[in-house]
Amino acid sequence: MKPYQRQFIEFALDKQVLKFGEFTLKSGRKSPYFFNAGLFNTGRDLALLGRFYAEALVDSGIEFDLLFGPAYKGIPIATTTAVALAEHHDKDLPYCFNRKEAKDHGEGGNLVGSALRGRVMLVDDVITAGTAIRESMEIIQAHGATLAGVLISLDRQERGRSEISAIHEVERDYGCNVISIITLKDLITYLEEKPEMAEHLAAVRAYWEEFGV
């Protein structure tokens, strides 16, 4: 695990974005941890979040021309990541995002920001069922662009209804890499380093053994 990944876990814990306990997910599955990226909700939070996303992008080595943030959660992520890439990595790249409803006046259309073209890096918080990715792919393909990859904050590394995860389904269906700032394995590694979190480690390990991919 790299330093920025460890720092991201501590950032998420500090902001209570990442919590341990017993949580019932939308699927009905009981999880020993919960991740709610919506709690990154101040200016400083967003500035830091953008730096972690930018670090993961640079670390991945994936080549891309533009950042795309699917409405709604992906919008601030794309914006802050673009700023962080320019300020901290000297990479001044365009970004855009979609509207849920297309405008019929003013600039019109369903996109805001740069023209959607070239190799597109999609940024979002998490992938649960992959629905937002599929909707975004329709937009990307309609503009003649290609998907270079997808970056999310946390890869839960668990299977959904089938034997593979929603992330693996996206990789299979669109032939792209899905990368993340951290994975469930990183979280387990972090817990292993913290004796005071031993009770959570046992629960997360058990969950991984039952549902992990």
UniProtKB/Swiss-Prot annotation:
Catalysed reactions, as listed in the record: orotidine 5'-phosphate + diphosphate = orotate + 5-phospho-alpha-D-ribose 1-diphosphate
Entry binding sites for orotate: F34, F35, T128, R156
Keywords, sorted A to Z: Glycosyltransferase, Magnesium, Pyrimidine biosynthesis, Transferase
Cofactor(s) it depends on: Mg(2+)
Gene Ontology, cellular component aspect: cytoplasm
EC id: 2.4.2.10
InterPro entries recorded: OPRT, Or_phspho_trans_dom, PRibTrfase_dom, PRTase-like
Pathway: Pyrimidine metabolism; UMP biosynthesis via de novo pathway; UMP from orotate: step 1/2
Purpose: Catalyzes the transfer of a ribosyl phosphate group from 5-phosphoribose 1-diphosphate to orotate, leading to the formation of orotidine monophosphate (OMP).
Family per similarity comment: Belongs to the purine/pyrimidine phosphoribosyltransferase family. PyrE subfamily.
Protein name: Orotate phosphoribosyltransferase
Origin species: Salmonella arizonae (strain ATCC BAA-731 / CDC346-86 / RSK2980)
